[in-house]
Swiss-Prot record:
Plays an important role in the de novo pathway of purine nucleotide biosynthesis. Catalyzes the first committed step in the biosynthesis of AMP from IMP. Its EC number is 6.3.4.4. It is found in: Cytoplasm. Its main location: cytoplasm. HAMAP family: Adenylosucc_synth. GO terms for cellular component: cytoplasm. It catalyses: IMP + L-aspartate + GTP = N(6)-(1,2-dicarboxyethyl)-AMP + GDP + phosphate + 2 H(+). This is Adenylosuccinate synthetase. The lineage of its organism: Bacteria, Pseudomonadati, Pseudomonadota, Gammaproteobacteria, Enterobacterales. Substrate binds at A300, T301, T302, G303, R304, R305, R306.
Length: 432
């Protein structure tokens, strides 16, 4: 039988999923995106060459791998074409390697206009979205008025449906938000110009994945964002609009949940967050600056500087519960090099003095939380690029062991640099 492995983030995104997916796809036949959209930013460094992908799965650079965008992904046609064009200019035959679900909702210009108008109207209470129309596109999906990739097979009917939706959203844009209307004809012309390219890549994803499983193929499911940004389980309302957790694999691809064999949680050796929302372990002074600069903590999608802080093991434990994690991949260990001591958040103290060891569900519940820290010794030696587990400093090994003890999950992979080769695979998920 085949093996289905899920790779997802255990924190607030930006954990280093892209590199790990790219590494593990060496053994995979398919790589599947199952949620999110081009608000993701997955950075791959292969032989020193950097590639940033937002929508196309990270397996696209491997010639023996088929990349799939599942129904749980909201797809911006213009963003997909831009990414395809850039990759094709580098000699990557994207159209031979990429497949799409016809059930993918389309992100169109009115979604982007709504996203930006709403963020502006929220003022100081802005969520910090990427402004790419992700949330409004999911809204249209749930309201059952959204257009999907499959609608492009019938261009005349697509035009009629689009006109109704543009009129609906333009009313809100013009009358409530007092911004310009979206040009229906331009939207229609732009989408129809590339419709045939998109429909040529359409496949029944659920059927494909089921048959792949029966054949014994290895499949990798690539998560975007992170567990604490999940629409249901994250720091609501400072979350994304999709299910970033393991449950999203089944609903976002059509694979039966019993067929998931291993869930790999990517955990950064410290914490980061982009945009607004709770972040109990956030650091503002010298150590925070160290993590930000040494870790190059700037968003691959937005370019925004990420907030940085100590590892929040309470939040990571929540990710263990929700995702039924099989193992961790620890990333950016080298960023902690040179710190005399390292702190791990093992609990929270509420404003009334009560100590808790689980995360609140809504953002309001995080207000006034104080992290309870455990301090461990740091190390002065460099871990950058180390490929042999036994050659890591003893203090680094102790830190790794402590994370395993607190979370109850083994660290199966350790990343010590951005390049694909700078990785230690202690237990391969496809063999676990």
């Amino acid at each position: 039988m085949g093996k289905n492995v899920v790779v997802l983030g255990t924190q607030w995104g930006d954990e280093g999923k892209g590199k790990v997916v790219d590494l593990l796809t060496e053994r995979a036949k398919y790589v599947v995106r199952y949620q999110g959209g081009h608000n993701a930013g997955h950075t791959l460094v292969i032989n020193g060459e950097k590639t940033v992908l937002h929508l196309i799965p990270s397996g696209i650079l491997r010639e023996n791998v088929v990349s799939i965008i599942g129904n749980g992904v909201v797809l911006a046609p213009d963003a997909l074409m831009k990414e395809m064009t850039e990759l094709e200019a580098r000699g990557v035959p994207v159209r031979e390697r990429l497949l799409l679900s016809e059930a993918c909702p389309l992100i169109l210009p009115y979604h982007v206009a709504l996203d930006n108008a709403r963020e502006k109207a929220r003022g100081a209470k802005a969520i910090g979205t990427t402004g790419r129309g992700i949330g409004p596109a999911y809204e249209d999906k749930v309201a059952r008025r959204g257009l999907r990739v499959g609608d492009l097979f019938d261009k005349e009917t697509f035009a009629v449906k689009l006109k109704e939706i543009v009129e609906y959203h333009n009313f809100q844009l013009v009358n409530y938000y007092k911004v310009d209307a979206v040009d229906y004809q331009k939207v229609l012309d732009d989408v129809l110009a590339i419709a045939d390219i998109l429909t040529a890549m359409v496949v029944d994803v659920s059927d494909l994945l089921y048959k792949a499983h029966l054949r014994g193929d290895f499949v990798m499911f690539e998560g975007a964002q992170g567990t604490l940004l999940d629409i249901d389980h994250g720091t609501y309302p400072y979350v994304t609009s999709s299910n970033t957790t393991a449950g999203g694999v089944a609903t976002g691809s059509g694979l039966g949940p019993r067929y998931v064999d291993y869930v790999l949680g990517i955990v950064k050796a410290y914490s980061t967050r982009v945009g607004a929302g709770p972040f109990p372990t956030e650091l503002f002074e010298e150590v925070g600056e160290h993590l930000s600069q040494k870790g190059n903590e700037f968003g691959a999608t937005t370019g925004r500087r990420r907030r940085t802080g100590w590892l929040d093991a309470v939040a990571v434990r929540r990710a263990v519960q929700i995702n039924s994690l099989s193992g961790f991949c620890l990333t950016k260990l080298d960023v902690l090099d040179g710190l005399k001591e390292i702190k791990i958040c093992v609990g929270y103290r509420l404003p009334n003095g009560t100590e808790v060891d689980t995360t609140p569900l809504a953002a309001e519940g995080w207000e006034g939380l104080e992290p309870i820290y455990e301090t461990v010794p740091g190390w002065s030696e460099s871990t950058f690029g180390v490929k042999d587990h036994s050659k890591l400093p003893q203090a680094a090994l102790n830190y790794i062991k402590r994370i395993e003890e607190i979370t109850g999950v083994p660290i199966d992979i350790i990343s010590t640099g951005p390049d694909r080769s700078e990785t230690m695979v202690l237990r391969d998920p496809f063999d676990a």
